[in-house]
Regions:
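A conserved non-catalytic segment of reverse transcriptases
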Residues: 203, 282, 286-354
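Duplex nucleic acid-engaging cores and interfaces of nucleic-acid transaction enzymes
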Residues: 113-120, 182
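A glycine-rich phosphate-binding loop feature that marks nucleotide/adenosyl-phosphate handling sites
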Residues: 254-255, 291-298, 359-363, 383-391, ...
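Short, solvent-exposed helix-loop connector elements
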Residues: 214-219, 327, 343-358, 369-382, ...
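Core structural elements
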Residues: 37-42, 91-92, 100, 202, ...
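Conserved polymerase palm-domain catalytic core
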Residues: 74-77, 81-96, 100, 132-297, ...
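Non-catalytic, polymerase-adjacent accessory regions of viral genome-replication enzymes
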Residues: 1-67, 72
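A terminal-accessory region detector
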Residues: 380-429
Length: 429
């Protein structure tokens, strides 16, 4: 299997497909399946799946097992199965992920083989749909990010965006209509073998314990292909909003997370009504409690979006003039999640034998990631709070390790020690 320069070859393939799709929005692609089992595409798919890590699926075969078998041999077997039409996906292994509120979120884990085939399929079909996706969509797309979505929201709120429709699509991934999804996919793809793959992944079933469940609704949250399928499905919302909703407000969508920034309450009510109408066309519903219209006018209310809380607050210019500005800072849920992660990585019972340097080494990448995402010019207070929490957590660890009765004694000593040993700070100051 030739794998040299696979990344560049894949980039050229995707660019060609994108430009072809962009030239004609009615063109349907009939020869995509052979791209899925190309050597360079399969190898690039493997590299991406490996980089994403993740545990094994129902077959128990993990990344390390495949490396022991031999990557080239394993990919050649997948290629043969695809070429001969013998590939059949396995059920998705379901695990329950704890949420901050105490409830659980189901997550589907496909086998590594299925993840590779899904990634290869995504490489082949994503450029075609990218040509149709709208500017208001930011989630799980090339060269687009949550930070970009947050910046659009911030600017829209500052530009007389006094009312916000904070929308929550009820159990989106569980309620995607598979037949409608296939019809939307068929608008751009006529290759029956690609469509068969997408359908197979939808009906392969979910294994939870020893119980196999096959549903006619939904797409597995956690699979490689599901974010792209979500964007294909919700592109209908984006297109209809572009056609009918721009006079009501600015739609910003990140996968199924959606907000609409409006200039007055009347527009917000119209926006919500239109959104409910579009959801009905997609066989989806807005959560009756979580979906709400938020007044940003006086700063008494705010909303959460992509881990950030948004609220208009009074600030002061260098000349002492007061004005309102939209502040973005970590939501309560995000703060709670970060603090739990800090505690897990520093103050766990099994970590009492660890060296301080090792704890710092493990925590620093997380701090850098959080800082890159959450740090803004308006949220220094929250970053300082997290820095103090980290200091306190290290202090508790230090005192437990040295069997001191007072958990917060020697806090100054610990603070100096961890920063001297290279601990990163969340705050800029």
């Amino acid at each position: 299997m030739q794998t040299n320069n696979s990344k560049e070859k894949v980039r050229q393939l995707q660019n060609k497909l994108y430009l072809t799709a962009k030239k004609c929005d009615s063109r349907r692609f009939h020869a995509l399946y052979d791209k899925v089992y190309r050597d360079d595409v399969l190898f690039e798919a493997w590299k991406r799946v490996k980089a994403n890590k993740g545990s094994s699926g129902v077959d128990g075969i993990g990344i390390e097992d495949i490396e022991e078998m031999g990557i080239e041999k394993y990919l050649s077997e997948i290629k043969s199965e695809l070429m001969d039409g013998k590939y059949k996906p396995s059920p998705v292994k379901r695990v329950m992920i704890p949420k901050p509120d105490g409830s659980e979120r189901p997550l589907g884990i496909p086998t590594v083989k299925d993840r590779i085939v899904q990634m290869a399929t995504k490489i082949a079909i994503e450029p075609v749909f990218e040509a149709d996706f709208r500017d208001c969509s930011y989630g799980f797309r090339p060269k687009r990010s949550a930070r970009q979505a947050l910046e659009v929201v911030r600017k829209a709120c500052n530009n007389k965006g006094y009312y916000v429709v904070d929308a929550d699509i009820e159990k989106f991934f569980d309620n995607v209509n598979q037949d409608k999804l296939m019809k939307l996919a068929e608008q751009r793809i006529s290759d029956r073998r690609i469509l068969k793959l997408i359908r197979q992944w939808s009906v392969s079933g979910v294994l939870y314990g020893n119980v196999l469940t096959i549903s006619e609704l939904g797409t597995s949250q956690g699979s490689v292909i599901s974010p792209l399928l979500a964007n294909i499905y919700l592109n209908t919302l984006d297109r209809l909003w572009e056609k009918y909703g721009l006079t009501h407000g600015i739609l910003v969508r990140y996968a199924d997370d959606t907000v609409i920034i409006c200039k007055n309450k009347k527009n917000a009510n119209h926006a919500l009504n239109l959104l409910q109408y579009i959801m009905a066309k997609l066989d989806l519903k807005l959560h009756p409690v979580k979906t709400k219209i938020v007044s940003m006018w006086d700063g008494k209310e705010g909303f959460d979006f992509l881990g950030m809380h948004h609220r208009r607050m009074t600030t002061e210019t260098s000349k002492g003039q007061l004005y309102k500005e939209t502040y973005q800072y970590p939501s309560r849920k995000a703060m709670k999640k970060m603090k739990a992660e800090i505690k897990k990585n520093v103050n766990g019972r099994s970590l009492l034998v660890a060296k301080e340097e090792d704890l710092i080494k493990n925590l620093n990448p997380k701090i850098i990631g959080w800082k890159n995402y959450y740090s803004t010019k308006t949220n220094e207070t929250w970053m300082q709070e997290l820095d103090w929490y980290i200091i306190c957590t290290f202090t508790r660890w230090y005192n437990k390790k040295h069997q001191r009765r007072k958990h917060m004694s020697r806090v100054g000593f610990v603070r100096n020690s961890i920063y001297e040993k290279g601990l990163k700070k969340m705050a800029r100051a």
